[in-house]
From Swiss-Prot:
Protein name per its UniProtKB record: Serine/threonine-protein kinase WNG1
Sequence ranges assigned to domain Protein kinase in this UniProt record: 291-593
One GO cellular component, as annotated: extracellular region
Outcome reported for the amino acid change (mutating R258A): Loss of proteolytic cleavage by ASP5
Statement: the UniProt record of this protein carries the keyword Secreted: yes
Compositionally biased region (Basic and acidic residues): 124-141, 248-279, 631-640
Keywords carried by this UniProt record: ATP-binding, Kinase, Magnesium, Metal-binding, Nucleotide-binding, Secreted, Serine/threonine-protein kinase, Signal, Transferase
GO molecular function: ATP binding; metal ion binding; protein serine/threonine kinase activity
Family: Belongs to the protein kinase superfamily. STE Ser/Thr protein kinase family. WNG subfamily.
Residue ranges with Low complexity bias: 175-186
Signal peptide residues on this chain, from the entry's feature table: 1-70
Amino acid sequence: MPEQDLASGFLLRFQNARPVCLSVGSFVSFRTVQPRKMRDRGWRCVWHRMAGVGALFGIFGVLCTVEAGATVAAPQVETGPLLSVRAPRSPLHLRDVDAPEVTHASSEGSPQFESSLSQQRLRRPADRGEAHNGEEPRKDAATQTVRGYGGQSTEPPPASIVPVSSEAPQDGAEQRQASSAAESLAGLDPDAGDTGLRSQEMDEEGSGAAQDMERAHAAQPTVSTWDDAHLVQVSTSHPDMFPVDGSFSKKQEGRRERRLAVRGDDSFARGHNRDRDASNGRSILRRAPGWAKIAALATGLLVSAFGYSSYKHGGPRVALRIHKLHLKRKLPISWRRYLNNLPVLDERLFPEFEDILPWLRRGARLVKRVPHVSEALADFIGLDEETRRTGIVIKVKSSTDAEARRLVYEVNAHANMVPDNPFFLPIIGAYQGASKRAVYMILPRARADVADYVRARPYDVDVRLAAAEMVYSNYILHTHGFLHRDIKAHNYFVTFDGHVVLADFEGVGVLQQRTPVVGTRGYFAPELSRATDHTEKSDVFALGQTLKRLVKYMRPTVRVPHLRELWALTKRMTAKDPEERPTLKQVMEDPYFDGIDFERLEAKDQGVPFRGDFSIDDPDAGGKMYIPPSKEQDHEQENE
């Protein structure tokens, strides 16, 4: 059928092209993940290579699946009753070989052969005497009459019956024997005079061989070999199979797909075992069960996906940590779905949002402090008595043409990633506006950020205790496997009890995670100017810069205790070489913090770093809205 011909041709071409596909896939995969930056030196290169190996597994799994489908679609060889092939007038005395029913193999335009059934049958040696009826056989071997089991005679085409194996190649002895047989068949002389005598001798020997084979098959289980070797009928005029001089060239003898097999009964079984043991990957794949192919494909895809994830995130440990967060639902797989699951807040129902809506344009980010919350909004978001008294902060992000991840990443970081600790600013709630124009975060209000508080009330600040709480909050974040990546004085806030809390988790990331560089100019570590990732040492550098700015914000008339030790510590923390910077654990053990017990710091019983009742907000019901400055304005403020 045309469909079967198409499937057979596709399978043959695919099997020949598979090594090329694997070679090209190997080269592309390894070149794609080859390190191109100085940051990729060291152990990360191993996981770059792992991504390539995983890609190879994936490619091989896909190829195996396609080949398996093509094998199923290819025409199946049906085997009929075992018949005996008789080579007339051969100068080499050969034993009879069992063969199934065969058909003419198409040799025009392609060396590919078809193995479907034909209507012509070869007769067995036991039927020859009855078929001839005492007559001499014809001298023309090409037009000799062949009788089947039913006694019906047919005229075979001018062709030679040659057993061909599609699996493992023969050894040298079998090839020489097959070549000699082919030469004898190709060099027949139709005009020889001893045709009758030779035919009669071969009839007798063939009958004895057939009886021996029947007894052998009855004594031991029959081994079916027609899955690995089958017979095809090839035209003697084919230039590749039968050269003009009647002999096979060395190239033709060594060709795997055209191996000749002339065996007896027991040698036939031994040849089947040799073919089975020496089978290549294609035969193993065809004999493999379906579940094994599916498992190989799934394994390849999993290894490829994990290799790519390790390369993307910066290593296998980071990839496993991120996938673990996915499984624990602390890191959403779909940010759009996470955004759509946020509760809806109707801005028209609450007076706190009246002056926010006019500012909602593309890319707008607003922060509004609300010292006095209306009863309607307090009941809607479920505020407790203390928060109703101190007020809230509404952080607004415009959703016009904005990515879902940028809108809700900080929401998820506050809710799921940041540990529950008194030195972190908690989140009250997150909502999407009914107008679909913004996402709102509700946070508890603080007195001010550290920078503004130190500028306004420098005499009410205990610098060493404030620095200790700032270092400890960052240390807790690192111990839970996260980086802040935007440490600065404006991201530390002073609560109403006078202690420090860390906020603004929009840039928080997993330790050693490969992500774009974020932060504020003036706090960037020197290594971030190159193609590298955030590390714990980059947060240490930013924290050292923050402590330096904290001292600079103090007025010149204010005396700072232990200033010499503080400058020595900040100098170590801001070293250009990341290897020379201390870890946060070493920072807490520095002589500057002698007398501070970090294990009891969470109890907040060692003093208050920010004394007084200073608040940056005006005590009006509407609150004061703060629009964050641009990066250029923020940089100018930091350099003042």
